[in-house]
Each structure stands twice: as structure tokens, then as C-alpha cells.
Amino acid sequence: AGGWSDGKLTYHTSIGGQLSKYCGDEKAMELMDQVINNFKRFHPKPEEVQCSNPVAEPDFIKPYFGLRLFPVWHVGTDYLHEIGKNWYQYLVDGGVNFYWESKVSDINFKTNEVIFKSVKPEFTNMDNDSIFYDNLIFGVGKSGIDFGKQLAEKYNLPTEPKSVQIGVRFEAPQKHFQKLIDVSYDFKLYRKYDDEGVSLRSFCTNNNAAYVAAEHTYGDISYNGHAKKDPSYRNDM
């Protein structure tokens, strides 16, 4: 859950990533436990973290859709920044270094060296322009896709394609979905069309406190719903 996301954690290997592909389902579930426990640990009000765990598909949807039966934890968008601050301070106190206002410009895989350049030299906290590593995790968001592609092409790094999911977001009054919400706060409906080789699923339902944030990437606009916990944000959407 990013700092501007819907503040929910899906507890299953079938949605949200390929972790089990690399470490197996059992280890993936163990790591998910660690993530959820840390979100509670650094939450200013951990007692408000809500778990929705449907145990059976309701009869009224069976002719049309299936329902994923696994837990979803609602942390709350309005708490994510404070959780991030607490988590950050814990890492700093443990000796982890963060380098701000700096940008990775290259990686030398022969010398195990990450090359930096300062974006705003007056604010950077780096003493050197490179860092040596024993092991490197290269994790970038959408804004780093081009840089990742440049590195892969420059050093002939092996890559593999990832499936693409296309989503459409719409807002509707909560009353139209209340029967489903009573079964599962963040209900996950799905339907497979085997003859077409495609499937549909619902995701990111932000019930009774839905706010939409716009994100601009490469000239396109995408939207991400917020699911806030504080009752004062409730808007019946």
C-alpha cells in the first residue's frame, strides 16, 4: 500500500504480484504476515485495523460472479503517512541510510557499484557519488520504467514480459453494493471467459469513504481511490 493508495492489504498469493513464483506460496504467506504485522506495529491506532474475511459465496451472486474467499485488511488511507513516518524512523534508528534528492544514474555490475548524481545538491545528504553493494534490489515505480529499460539494454540484462491488467474506475452510491459489503468490505468478484481466454475481476472498492486522486504519468492521467477510516470522511460512496 503506497502512501497515496487505498490503504488496504490483500492477504493472498493469487492477487497483487508474483511473489510466490520466486519463493513459493508458503514463504509468500509468511512474508505477508510480516507486512501486515508491521502495518499494525507502526499504525498510530492499531486497534482500528479492520480485517474482512468472507467464508462463503452469497447465493445472490452465484449466477453471475464468483467471490474470492480470503482476508483483506483495511488500514486506512488517512493513516498511511503516519505509518510511513513511524516505519521510516524505525529503519533509521536501526542504521538504515536514506539518500534524499539524489538520483541513480548508472549501476556498474562489474564493480558492484551504484552511481548517483544529486538532483538538488544543497539538500542531498550523500558524502560520495557512489555506493558499493553486496546484494542489490532494484525496485522502481512507474516513473523509473524508462531508466530500468535503459539499464537492461545497456548491459543486456535478461527480462521477461509481465501480464497487463486494464481497469475502469467508476463511482456509485454505496447503497447499491451494501449486500456485498456486508459479506466482505473489499469484495473481490471474478468471472472467467474460457472461450475468450480472458477474465474479469473487481478490485479496490473504497466503501463509504471513497475519494479519488489523480496521478499524471507520461502525459496520461490515472486514478486511485482512497479508503479512509475516520468517520468524518464518510460520503456514502
What is the role of each PLM region?
Residues 1-22, 49-237:
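Residues forming the flavin
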